[in-house]
Amino acid sequence: MRRCPCRGSLNEAEAGALPAAARMGLEAPRGGRRRQPGQQRPGPGAGAPAGRPEGGGPWARTEGSSLHSEPERAGLGPAPGTESPQAEFWTDGQTEPAAAGLGVETERPKQKTEPDRSSLRTHLEWSWSELETTCLWTETGTDGLWTDPHRSDLQFQPEEASPWTQPGVHGPWTELETHGSQTQPERVKSWADNLWTHQNSSSLQTHPEGACPSKEPSADGSWKELYTDGSRTQQDIEGPWTEPYTDGSQKKQDTEAARKQPGTGGFQIQQDTDGSWTQPSTDGSQTAPGTDCLLGEPEDGPLEEPEPGELLTHLYSHLKCSPLCPVPRLIITPETPEPEAQPVGPPSRVEGGSGGFSSASSFDESEDDVVAGGGGASDPEDRSGSKPWKKLKTVLKYSPFVVSFRKHYPWVQLSGHAGNFQAGEDGRILKRFCQCEQRSLEQLMKDPLRPFVPAYYGMVLQDGQTFNQMEDLLADFEGPSIMDCKMGSRTYLEEELVKARERPRPRKDMYEKMVAVDPGAPTPEEHAQGAVTKPRYMQWRETMSSTSTLGFRIEGIKKADGTCNTNFKKTQALEQVTKVLEDFVDGDHVILQKYVACLEELREALEISPFFKTHEVVGSSLLFVHDHTGLAKVWMIDFGKTVALPDHQTLSHRLPWAEGNREDGYLWGLDNMICLLQGLAQS
């Protein structure tokens, strides 16, 4: 017990008789905030507050304590017209909010002295009754929280929060950096659209859409708002600034790295590499600075972004001088329109007519160019890699068997254009209707070749289009390896050559594809013209691959590990083809022997097939499929260019082709393939 300067020493009985406020003032520790020179304590009867004891005792707000008047406890701030200033405390990053929890701190004008921080802590031994009597705010000293022990409506704020403080009637705005936590009232809430709002006792004002308020110091020490559109507004002193969130807490972005916060739509915002954050909204994403500025968007209007260059210059020039208001990092992200999906183009074959053809292979250049007439490229190396997937994506959105179709997509890829296929019922595939293929499949269902072709289930109408429904050949395989081999000594019909000669039209796309494979292939005239005719290109195409030397060529291979190779345009020599086939089966002699057996059975069926003898089979492929279980099968696919011969005419399918004899060299190529695979299986 220390001696009171105006009274003698007190014994315990006398001390107990004093009012609680006076006794607490006597017991307060030394070393609190000192008075400035020239400011004397007013004597008795000098207009002291009613709470001051007789004899010039301590003020109701003593050194080291933080007492508030009754209006402040009610959350109303100082009484109107009050001119008496209130003391300001300097703490180690912690503020003393009013009882209403609005994060308000008042300060004495033009007085800022930093006392000994040890004197700012109050004794924990004071009873709860004493605290209730004096409305004292205490600092626990254990977890760094400023708490009001009698407020039940306060909630803690995360550690990285930084309060916005409001001065008294005549005081400036200040911002205090905190490292601890501060309690905030749960009832301080506003509409949760992440806009800065100014809550007034009479009205609620909102900032203009797209404006990003910040603060800048002026010459007289007051604070002004700085909007992202360059305008400034004098600060209103009637109420505090609050940053509303959906949970009622007030938060401030860390100056070093922004935290991720949920947007109005519940989406998670993504962290940029420079520390700023992007907040998506209901109709688009916006980019917001990582520190003090928020580019919020109300639900009833769009956000207008200012010019990036003007905004950045304005913010940095006005805010970099303030140590209390870190410069916000604002990044304007231009909106990039999402690329629209490419529509599925019309089929390259003329449907429904005797001269119409479906695609025989997605890797056959000449097939896609023969009747297209539009210069579309079918070579997978010449087309965009995403284009087939866009077509497939459009196709699959109508399918109830998406997973099954994706699993078996390699067969579609190796056997025809993805845009010509859709998934049918389980175990079936829908291929765009072609009358030539329809007639061929209907006849093959009654032919000895029936086991070697996909089962045909007739025509179906789906989504306004007609399809041929056939068997999914990969339904019984697990992780299959697939190879597509184009059979025959030519892949174009004689009628196509005749039509091309009747209407010759040099094509630039044919020239470009020819030069891409062999720059020296075009003649000097073709080089000068920059174009070649279709017959010239088709005949040259056959001579570049093993079609002209072996009667078949490898179109594409998809391995079980997912690798796919279609670069076989120059695979012509026997040694090259042998190496590709050996790699396809990974040197598995058992698989090779099964393939040889299947091909021999197919050859026997072809030699006795009435259909095969009376049809010119051009552009058809053999589909090789095997998997890790040892299952291996071969099918004939793609009959879009299979046409019937004139009456009483048959083909051997082994004779060399000469224009007019209609020989296709199918069996010649099959004989060479069987011989080659037999050699691999026996080696």
From Swiss-Prot:
Entry's Gene Ontology BP terms: cellular response to calcium ion; inositol phosphate biosynthetic process; phosphatidylinositol phosphate biosynthetic process
Disordered: annotated span: 1-124, 147-308, 334-387
Listed Gly residues bias regions: 44-58
Region (Calmodulin-binding): 509-517
Swiss-Prot/TrEMBL catalytic activity: 1D-myo-inositol 1,4,5-trisphosphate + ATP = 1D-myo-inositol 1,3,4,5-tetrakisphosphate + ADP + H(+)
Positions of modified residues (Phosphoserine): S127, S162, S404
Subcellular location per the Swiss-Prot or TrEMBL entry: Nucleus; Cytoplasm
InterPro entries: IPK, IPK_sf
Enzyme Commission no: 2.7.1.127
Ways its activity is controlled: Activated by calcium/calmodulin. Inhibited by high concentrations of the substrate Ins(1,2,4)P3, and allosterically activated by the product Ins(1,3,4,5)P4.
GO molecular function: ATP binding; calmodulin binding; inositol hexakisphosphate kinase activity; inositol-1,4,5-trisphosphate 3-kinase activity
Top-rank taxon, per record: Eukaryota
Start-end of Polar residues biased regions: 196-206, 267-289
Location of Phosphothreonine modifications: T336
Residues reported in the UniProt entry to bind ATP: K431, E471, D472, L473, D484, K558, D638
Top class in the EC scheme: transferase
Gene Ontology CC: cytoplasm; cytosol; nuclear speck; nucleus
Binding site for substrate: 486, 507-513, 534-541, 641
Motif (Nuclear export signal): 324-332
Pfam families linked: IPK
Family named by the database record: Belongs to the inositol phosphokinase (IPK) family.
Function: Catalyzes the phosphorylation of 1D-myo-inositol 1,4,5-trisphosphate (InsP3) into 1D-myo-inositol 1,3,4,5-tetrakisphosphate and participates to the regulation of calcium homeostasis. Can phosphorylate inositol 2,4,5-triphosphate to inositol 2,4,5,6-tetraphosphate.
Protein name: Inositol-trisphosphate 3-kinase C
Protein source organism: Homo sapiens (Human)
